[in-house]
């Protein structure tokens, strides 16, 4: 009896402890859901979107974090997480190791050489790296109560949200296509920006990409001390970027550009629809030239004269627009129907991606600034399929520039430099190639005001624009490539001890019958087996007999491919092995 009483007492104690823990867990869950709801209320309430807190907590504590990435290096990697957590106190992401944890790639210490991935699209920038700390899932017992984020998250950094070029090139375009890289993400994801900036001047543009309000790092503190994402994608695709800013070598086009005008225009179509901007005809009722007017620096000092001369030269209306005085939707509406866009070098020129096909971009450069050294907008305008004409004009007359050496250094001032360096900069005729981002000579020159020499500008434009500028109706500009030639065959014959013939034939690529192609040619490579060199032939027919330099009793390797319009090279068919 005594032992039975003791056992019953212990059992009651255990049951009481279990019930107490269950009640506390339910209270815990209710409290956290209320906190999350309150935290989200001012941002973007999501009716009906809740998470089963006890189940989520159990999955995290038992299973841990799960990660699978695409990409071979940190510069091209995007990772998909389940149950990735973030400590607002430590400002670090956490990977909890549990029974079901997966970490692919499992890099060990190589994860810190230098990072798991880039959070922004600016490649290998040491302020944009992403990594996490590791903990056993059991550590959750000693940590703040986790708040589970029910949304699918896309976690990234904005590079410079106050600069329109950076907003489009580094953020919006990559975000747009990253959201479409994974099924359903564009409709479900909430954007989480972790770089630490405030909203910035163009935050409304980021809101267009997702039906859910983006969140900044500073806003996460209102949700809880420890946040856990049930489902998160981390990183951005860099495939749409075309320019590097000069952190390692002087700025210029990327070495391997993978985007075309087609992808740019798909993006701009989406943006104009979200901005409620119509492409149906010019908003002013006629064709016009659009001039970007700057109001604070890099001014065009004879802007009125420039407008008049452009109107007279091209017999078209001229209109000014500025980022300061127009809404961005109005800017897009004007740009997307303009025949020509004229602007000083600057971030506003990224709006050229909204220009219609056949329009002209005219970029003006201040004194001593070489257009060949600063080409983000030239590179954009000349992407395959953008179908824009590009003109660069440079002020070559020192007297036509107004400098501002007294301004702060970040606005081109040079009075903080020693007198010898100031004198050198003032006498310089061209800014040397340099790295980003604080070169005083570059800043001094790029923030100059300019009186445009009208005759030299018109001469520069006329070298490119032969007739009346403006959009033109064009055929589908996408270049379609041939497939492999089919049924390639070879036949050899020997004529005597020193002569031989090699006949090669093939059928057209099967996709050719569905295409309208101006010119079709075939390239044939002949290589004697064992030799390192080959002889190329360009042919118009689907068969040919080779006699020159064909040897008897010799084996030849033969490759054949189709070429459209002299530049669209198809793949080689499988190699033919032909013996004479």
From Swiss-Prot:
All residue ranges annotated as the Fibronectin type-III domain in the record: 488-580
Membrane topology qualifier: Single-pass type II membrane protein
Cytoplasmic side, ranges: 1-4
Enzyme Commission (EC) number: 2.4.1.312
Pfam families from the UniProt entry: Glyco_transf_61 (PF04577)
GO BP terms in the entry: neuron migration; protein O-linked glycosylation; protein O-linked mannosylation
Enzyme class label: transferase
Transmembrane segments: 5-25
Topology, Lumenal side: 26-580
PROSITE patterns per record: FN3
Subcellular location: Endoplasmic reticulum membrane
Keywords, ordered alphabetically: Endoplasmic reticulum, Glycoprotein, Glycosyltransferase, Membrane, Signal-anchor, Transferase, Transmembrane, Transmembrane helix
Superkingdom to which the source organism belongs: Eukaryota
Xref: InterPro entries: FN3_dom, FN3_sf, Glyco_transf_61_cat, Glycosyltransferase_61, Ig-like_fold
Predominant localisation class: endoplasmic reticulum
Family per record: Belongs to the glycosyltransferase 61 family.
Protein name per UniProt: Protein O-linked-mannose beta-1,4-N-acetylglucosaminyltransferase 2
Encoding gene per record: Pomgnt2
């Amino acid at each position: 009896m005594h032992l039975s009483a003791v056992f019953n007492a212990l059992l009651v104690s255990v049951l009481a402890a279990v019930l107490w823990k269950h009640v506390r867990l339910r209270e815990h869950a209710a409290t956290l859901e209320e906190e999350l709801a309150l935290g989200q209320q001012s941002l973007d309430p999501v009716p009906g979107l809740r998470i089963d807190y006890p189940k989520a907590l159990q999955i995290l504590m038992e299973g841990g974090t799960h990660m699978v990435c695409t990409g071979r290096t940190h510069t091209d990697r995007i990772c998909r997480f389940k149950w990735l957590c973030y400590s607002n106190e430590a400002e670090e992401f956490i990977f909890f190791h549990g029974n079901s944890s997966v970490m692919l790639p499992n890099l060990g210490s190589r994860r810190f050489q230098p990072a798991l991935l880039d959070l922004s699209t600016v490649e290998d920038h040491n302020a944009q790296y992403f990594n996490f700390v590791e903990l056993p899932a059991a550590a959750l017992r000693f940590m703040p109560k986790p708040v589970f984020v029910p949304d699918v998250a896309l976690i990234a950094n904005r590079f410079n949200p106050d600069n329109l070029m950076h907003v489009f090139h580094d953020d919006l375009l990559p975000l747009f296509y990253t959201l479409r890289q994974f099924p359903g993400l564009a409709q479900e994801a909430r954007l989480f920006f972790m770089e630490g900036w405030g909203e910035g001047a163009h935050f409304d543009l980021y809101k267009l990409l997702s039906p859910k309000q983006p969140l900044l790092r500073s806003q996460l503190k209102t949700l809880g001390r420890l946040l856990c994402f049930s489902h998160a994608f981390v990183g951005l695709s860099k495939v749409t970027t075309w320019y590097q800013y000069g952190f390692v070598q002087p700025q210029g086009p990327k070495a391997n550009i993978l985007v075309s005008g087609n992808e740019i225009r798909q993006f701009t179509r989406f943006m104009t629809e979200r901005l409620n901007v119509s492409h149906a005809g010019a908003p002013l009722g006629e064709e016009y030239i659009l001039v970007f007017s700057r109001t604070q620096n890099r001014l065009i000092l004879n802007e009125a004269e420039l407008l008049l001369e452009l109107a007279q030269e091209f017999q078209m209306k001229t209109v000014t627009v500025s980022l300061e005085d127009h809404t961005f939707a109005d800017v897009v509406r004007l740009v997307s129907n303009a025949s020509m866009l004229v602007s000083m070098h600057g971030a506003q020129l990224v709006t050229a991606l909204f220009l219609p096909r056949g329009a002209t971009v005219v970029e003006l450069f201040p004194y001593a600034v070489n257009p060949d050294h600063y080409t983000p907008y030239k590179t954009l305008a000349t992407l395959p399929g953008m179908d824009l004409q590009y003109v660069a004009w440079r002020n070559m007359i020192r007297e036509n520039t107004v400098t501002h050496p007294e301004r702060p250094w970040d606005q081109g001032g040079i009075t903080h430099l020693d007198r010898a360096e100031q004198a050198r900069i003032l006498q310089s005729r061209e800014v040397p190639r340099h790295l980003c981002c604080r070169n005083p000579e570059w800043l001094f020159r790029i923030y100059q005001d300019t009186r445009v020499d009208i005759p030299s500008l018109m001469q520069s434009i006329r070298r490119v624009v032969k007739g009346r500028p403006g959009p033109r109706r064009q055929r589908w500009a996408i270049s379609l490539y041939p497939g492999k030639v089919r049924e390639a065959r070879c036949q050899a014959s020997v004529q005597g001890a020193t002569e031989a013939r090699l006949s090669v034939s093939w059928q057209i690529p099967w996709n050719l019958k569905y295409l309208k192609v101006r010119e079709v040619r075939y390239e044939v490579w002949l290589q004697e087996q064992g030799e390192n060199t080959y002889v190329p032939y360009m042919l118009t027919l689907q068969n040919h007999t080779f006699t020159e330099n064909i040897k008897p009793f010799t084996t030849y390797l033969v490759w054949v491919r189709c070429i459209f319009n002299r530049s669209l090279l198809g793949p080689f068919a499988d190699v033919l092995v032909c013996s004479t």
